[in-house]
C-alpha cells in the first residue's frame, strides 16, 4: 500500500504534464523510484533514512489530499472521487493477467510463509542486515559493529554503505510499514517486484505492439515465465529483480506522452526511475546498458509519431538527470564495478537455451538442443523477408542487435558460462524479448487460432515455473524465526552462531536480539573465532570442542555452553585432507586448493584453541609450518588474545616456519583459550598463509 500511496501521488503530480501509460505495475514502479532515490540520497549524505521514508510518505499523503480537494471543488459527487482514485491507481484488466502470472511463478514459494529461501546465492540476508544499519539512524553503523564484532559485522557494515542502496531503501520501507524485520520480507518483496515487472511490460506492449490485445498480452508474458529470469527470483536476488522491474518502468515512461513545451517533467521522471534502477544493481544495469538502450530506442521508435510522444532531447535529459542523481553513490558504484570486473563473482551456469526466450526451457541446467537454434535462424529469416515486403524502420532489428552485441561483449570478457553472462541474459529475456515477441504476434494476429497457440506456450511456461519453484533447495525453517524473542537465547550476552548452514547463519545473526552476536562459520564474510561460552547450533551438530551444557530450544536448534578443542603441549597437528577435524582450529577465509593445500587468505586470518592447564599463564610458542605470501614490503604481525605479540616469519613470502611467541600474561587473559590473529602491518593489505602443521610448546619445552 505504501508504494501505491507514493506511486499514485506521483501520477497525480505529473497530471496533464505527462501522460503515463496506465497499469498498476507502472504506478507501483513510480512509487518505488520515488521512495528509493530520496531515501538513498539522504542516507548517503549522512542523514536518517527512516526520517526520509516518513517524509516521502507524508509528501505523498499531502499530494493525495490536495488533489482530492481540487477534484471535489471541480466535480462534486462520489462518481468524481471514484474517477480520481482510478486515475491515480491506473489499474487495467491486464493487471489480472499479471497477477495470475505472478501466482503461477511464486505460489510454491509463498507456501513457505515469511521466511528466506534460495537456490545457491546468499545475498538476501545482506539486504536485511543493511536495513538494520539504515534503520538505526546516522550512527547506526557504529551500533551495528558493536553488536557484530566479527567478519560478518565488518562485511555487512561495508555493504550497507556501498552496495545496491536503492534495494535497501525499498526493503527499509517495507520493514517500517509492516513492522517485520527485513529478513522476513523476501516473499512479499518478491511478489510486488515480480508483479511490477509483469504488469509494466504488459502496459508497454499494449501501447507499442499492434494487433488484438489478448494475444499480444499472452505473448508478452511467455518470456516473463522463463526459468532463466525466474532463476534470479528463486535465488532471492532482490536487487536484480528490482532493477529489471524499474527498467520496464523506464520503457513505460518512454511509451507515454507529454506537452513538447515542458520536456523537463518527463525528463525528471525518467531520471528518477533510471537512477533507481541503477541503484538496485549497478553492475547489472551498466553491464546491460547496450541492450537497455536498444529497447529504449525500440519503444521510442514505435511511439515517435504518436501525439505528444517524447523526443530524443527529453530522453537525453533524463539520462543526464539519472547520472546527477547517482553522483552521491558514484564512488561506490565504481568500486563494485572494479570488484566484479574479472567476472569471477557467483558460480558457473550453462548458457541458456533459446527455448528460454518463450518460457519453454524446463530448468536452468538444460542442455541446448540444435533444434532451438534452428528456430531462431528461421525467425530471423522470417523477419528479414517481412521487412523486404514491408519497408520501414528496422526498430526490432535495433533492439535485437543491441541485445546480441551486449551479449557478445560480455561473453568475450567473461566467458559463455559465467554468472555475469547468465544474469545479463535473464535481464534481456524480460526487458527486450517481450517487446519483440509481442510485436511479432501482433503482426500475425490475423492467423487463425494464434491466441490458442500462444496460450499453450504460456501454459507450458507456467508449468515449468511452478515446478522450478517447488525445487528451490534452501528454505530457512520456521524454528529459526521462533527463536526471535526467546528469552533463553537472548539472555546470553554474547551468542556464537554455528548452525552448520551458511544460509541460516547470516539470517540468525540478523534476527536474534542478543547484545553481541558472532558468526563462527564462513558465509560471504570470513568466519570469526568464538567469543564467550554460548553458541546456537543445529540439534546434535557440533565440531568446535567439548560441550558443558545443552539446552533444547526446539526440534531444530540447541543452545550450548562449550569449550574449544585442546591442543596438547608438543602435539604436532597435521592439517592435510586426511585430517579435516584439525580445520576447526582455523577461522577467517580458509580454502583447500586443488592440490590439497590449505590456504588462509584475506586481510587477516585466525587460529583459536584451548591450552592445556600446564601452559595457561606460561609463555608459549606457536609454530606453523607452511608458506607465507605477503605483498612486497609488507611484514607479518600477530596478536594473541587481543595483545600484540612477537612473530618471526620467512620474510614477506616463501616457505618456512611462522613462530608466534605468546607471553605469559596473554595466555591467562581468556581462561584456557588462545586466539591468534595474523595480519599484515599495512591497513588494507592482504595475507596468504598455507599451513601444513601446527605445534604448541611452552617456553622451556
PLM features: residue spans?
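Transmembrane alpha-helical segments
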Residues: 110, 280-285, 406-413, 439-440, ...
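Membrane-embedded, hydrophobic transmembrane alpha-helices
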Residues: 1-89
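Membrane-interface helix-loop-helix junctions at transmembrane boundaries of multi-pass membrane enzymes
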Residues: 86-93, 207, 211-213, 260-264, ...
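Alpha-helical transmembrane segments at the extracellular/periplasmic loop-to-helix junctions
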Residues: 1-5, 323, 329-331, 345-394, ...
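Hydrophobic/aromatic-rich transmembrane helices and adjacent perimembrane loops
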Residues: 122-125, 132, 240, 286, ...
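Membrane-embedded helix bundles of polyisoprenyl
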Residues: 27-39, 100-106, 189-258, 263-295, ...
Amino acid at each position: 500500500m505504501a508504494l501505491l500511496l507514493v506511486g499514485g501521488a506521483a501520477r497525480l503530480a505529473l497530471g496533464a504534464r505527462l501522460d503515463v501509460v496506465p497499469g498498476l505495475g507502472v504506478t507501483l514502479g513510480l512509487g518505488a523510484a520515488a521512495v528509493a532515490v530520496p531515501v538513498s540520497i539522504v542516507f548517503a549524505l549522512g542523514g536518517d533514512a527512516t526520517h526520509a521514508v516518513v517524509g516521502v510518505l507524508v509528501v505523498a499523503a499531502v499530494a493525495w489530499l490536495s488533489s482530492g480537494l481540487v477534484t471535489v471543488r471541480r466535480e462534486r459527487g462520489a462518481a468524481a472521487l471514484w474517477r480520481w482514485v482510478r486515475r491515480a491507481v491506473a489499474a487495467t484488466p491486464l493487471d489480472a493477467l499479471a497477477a495470475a502470472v505472478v501466482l503461477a511463478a511464486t505460489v510454491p514459494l509463498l507456501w513457505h510463509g515469511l521466511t528466506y529461501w534460495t537456490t545457491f546465492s546468499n545475498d538476501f540476508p545482506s539486504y536485511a542486515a543493511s536495513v538494520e544499519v539504515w534503520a538505526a539512524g546516522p550512527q547506526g553503523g557504529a551500533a551495528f559493529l558493536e553488536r557484530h564484532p566479527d567478519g560478518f559485522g565488518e562485511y555487512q557494515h561495508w555493504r550497507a554503505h556501498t552496495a545496491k542502496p536503492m534495494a535497501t531503501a525499498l526493503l527499509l520501507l517495507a520493514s517500517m510499514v509492516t513492522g517485520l524485520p527485513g529478513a522476513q520480507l523476501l516473499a512479499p518483496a518478491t511478489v510486488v517486484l515480480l508483479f511490477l515487472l509483469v504488469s509494466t511490460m504488459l502496459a508497454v506492449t499494449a501501447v507499442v505492439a499492434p494487433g488484438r490485445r489478448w494475444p499480444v498480452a499472452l505473448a508478452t508474458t511467455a518470456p516473463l515465465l522463463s526459468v532463466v529470469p525466474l532463476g534470479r527470483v528463486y535465488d532471492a536476488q532482490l536487487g536484480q529483480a528490482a532493477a529489471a522491474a524499474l527498467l520496464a518502468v523506464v520503457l513505460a515512461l518512454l511509451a507515454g506522452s507529454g506537452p513538447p513545451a515542458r520536456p523537463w517533467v518527463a525528463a525528471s521522471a525518467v531520471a528518477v526511475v533510471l537512477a533507481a534502477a541503477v541503484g538496485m544493481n549497478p553492475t547489472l544495469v551498466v553491464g546491460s546498458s547496450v541492450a537497455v538502450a536498444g529497447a529504449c530506442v525500440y519503444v521510442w521508435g514505435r511511439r515517435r509519431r504518436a501525439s505528444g510522444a517524447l523526443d530524443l532531447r527529453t530522453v537525453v535529459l533524463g539520462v543526464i538527470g539519472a547520472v546527477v542523481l547517482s553522483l552521491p553513490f558514484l564512488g561506490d558504484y565504481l568500486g563494485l564495478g572494479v570488484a566484479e570486473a574479472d567476472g569471477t563473482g557467483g558460480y558457473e551456469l550453462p548458457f541458456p537455451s533459446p527455448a528460454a526466450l518463450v518460457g519453454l526451457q524446463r530448468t536452468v541446467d538444460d542442455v541446448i538442443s540444435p533444434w532451438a537454434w534452428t528456430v531462431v535462424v528461421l525467425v530471423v529469416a522470417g523477419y528479414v523477408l517481412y521487412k523486404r515486403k514491408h519497408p520501414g524502420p528496422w526498430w526490432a532489428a535495433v533492439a535485437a542487435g543491441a541485445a546480441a552485441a551486449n551479449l557478445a561483449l560480455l561473453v568475450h570478457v567473461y566467458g559463455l558460462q559465467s554468472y555475469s553472462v547468465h544474469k545479463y541474459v535473464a535481464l534481456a529475456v524480460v526487458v527486450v524479448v517481450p517487446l519483440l515477441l509481442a510485436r511479432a504476434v501482433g503482426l500475425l494476429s490475423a492467423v487463425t487460432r494464434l491466441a490458442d497457440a500462444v496460450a499453450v506456450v504460456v501454459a507450458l511456461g507456467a508449468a515449468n515455473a511452478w515446478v522450478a519453484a517447488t525445487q528451490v533447495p534452501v528454505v530457512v525453517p520456521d524454528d529459526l524465526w521462533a527463536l526471535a524473542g526467546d528469552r533463553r537465547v537472548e539472555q546470553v550476552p554474547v551468542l556464537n552462531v554455528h548452525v552448520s548452514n551458511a544460509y541460516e547463519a547470516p539470517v540468525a545473526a540478523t534476527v536474534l536480539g542478543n547484545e553481541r552476536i558472532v558468526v563462527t562459520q564462513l558465509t560471504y564474510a570470513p568466519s570469526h573465532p568464538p567469543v564467550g561460552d554460548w553458541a546456537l547450533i543445529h540439534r546434535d551438530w557440533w565440531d568446535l570442542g567439548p560441550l558443558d551444557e545443552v539446552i533444547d530450544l526446539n526440534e531444530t536448534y540447541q543452545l550450548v555452553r562449550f569449550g574449544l578443542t585442546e591442543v596438547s603441549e608438543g602435539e604436532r597437528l597435521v592439517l592435510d585432507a586426511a585430517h579435516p577435524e584439525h580445520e576447526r582450529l582455523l577461522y577467517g577465509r580458509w580454502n583447500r586448493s586443488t592440490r590439497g593445500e590449505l590456504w588462509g587468505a584475506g586481510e587477516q586470518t585466525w587460529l583459536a584453541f584451548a591450552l592445556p592447564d600446564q601452559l595457561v599463564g606460561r609463555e608459549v610458542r606457536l609454530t606453523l609450518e607452511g608458506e607465507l605470501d605477503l605483498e612486497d614490503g609488507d611484514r607479518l604481525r600477530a596478536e594473541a588474545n587481543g595483545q600484540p605479540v612477537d612473530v618471526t616469519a620467512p620474510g614477506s613470502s616463501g616457505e618456512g616456519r611462522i613462530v608466534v611467541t605468546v607471553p605469559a600474561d596473554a595466555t591467562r587473559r581468556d581462561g584456557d583459550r588462545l586466539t591468534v590473529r595474523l595480519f599484515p602491518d599495512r591497513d588494507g593489505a592482504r595475507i596468504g598463509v598455507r599451513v601444513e602443521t601446527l605445534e604448541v610448546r611452552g617456553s622451556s619445552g
